[in-house]
Amino acid sequence: MENFPTEYFLNTSVRLLEYIRYRDSNYTREERIENLHYAYNKAAHHFAQPRQQKMLKVDPKRLQASLQTIVGMVVYSWAKVSKECMADLSIHYTYTLVLDDSSDDPHPAMLNYFDDLQAGREQAHPWWALVNEHFPNVLRHFGPFCSLNLIRSTMDFFEGCWIEQYNFGGFPGSDDYPQFLRRMNGLGHCVGASLWPKDLFDERKHFLEITSAVAQMENWMVWVNDLMSFYKEFDDERDQISLVKNFVTCHEITLDEALEKLTQETLHSSKQMVAVFSDKDPQVMDTIECFMHGYVTWHLCDARYRLHEIYEKVKDQDTEDAKKFCKFFEQAANVGAVAPSEWAYPQVAQLANVRAKDDVKEAHKPILSSIELVE
């Protein structure tokens, strides 16, 4: 890729992985595949329902790709929660990815949002109608404080996606805008709060740790994502409203300076994450560490981020950063490179077609009279 700062990216990635002491040992291969298939299967059946198919209006290939990406993220990162919780979170976060990739103007469907919310009516916006229907399945896993974070952060995410519809990177001199938008659409509080299901953590007992984790995760999670996404977004016309690009516009700096700004903030956040929780409740630290390592594995292994292209490009180079990056990449691939054919079946489109055929058969069944039923 022309002009992509490969050497800088390698150095940054290596420092990040060293800071978090990357060593993903969350699962055996069998456990990983089992959890992937369980979460995928439940989520696929959810999105194959006629109501979801009709209201989402998403290209089947895009929906399939989105679901596989999100199931991977949840299973790899939320390694401590139950399989049922993984499945319900996979559905919720797939909805968010579908919205993130949407180009529909939300304004008309949001005119009566609060009135409908207050009156308990179904939302006019189809995304909100479906997300609200599924929310009880998600919230049943969490206490009230964590649940509030999930609800509020999801609302922020919707607003962030609304802003992004305008492809507005901020005005020059508006230094607060890039981080404002990234926090809005980053789902950091939703992610940070969903690590603590009530079957594993009493949120009253661990309230201080959970609150601190939500605060720290807000930046760490989105900054790592921005860093690991930088390659795939570098020349993608659809991804020009990124944090790095918005730094360039608002801070009036070069792309290299913007990338360095993101790098320093990500590395500082990584140091903080480890330092703050290293002497806290071991179960809390273990949960955070498993999330960080799994989250990195997911980025390195998921085809969406195309980091295998970087690996192929530099695997024969003799620089220290290239060798370290390749070692980390191979380490991630050894545990996380699982072909979708091993777990992502059946396809959502296949399930939807089966449901549609069943509905047609049901509609053509003869209607029995009351006399025939008695006989």
From Swiss-Prot:
Keyword RNA-binding: no
Reactions performed catalytically: (2E,6E)-farnesyl diphosphate = trichodiene + diphosphate
Single GO biological process annotation from the record: sesquiterpenoid biosynthetic process
Top-level taxon of the source organism: Eukaryota
GO molecular function, one term: trichodiene synthase activity
EC code(s) of this entry: 4.2.3.6
Enzyme class: lyase
Pathway annotation: Sesquiterpene biosynthesis; trichothecene biosynthesis
One Pfam family matching this protein: TRI5
Keyword terms, alphabetized: Lyase
Function text: TS is a member of the terpene cyclase group of enzymes. It catalyzes the isomerization and cyclization of farnesyl pyro-phosphate to form trichodiene, the first cyclic intermediate in the biosynthetic pathway for trichothecenes. It serves to branch trichothecene biosynthesis from the isoprenoid pathway.
Family to which the UniProt record says this protein belongs: Belongs to the trichodiene synthase family.
Other comments on record: Trichothecenes are sesquiterpenoid toxins that act by inhibiting protein biosynthesis.
This protein's name: Trichodiene synthase
Gene expressing this chain: TRI5
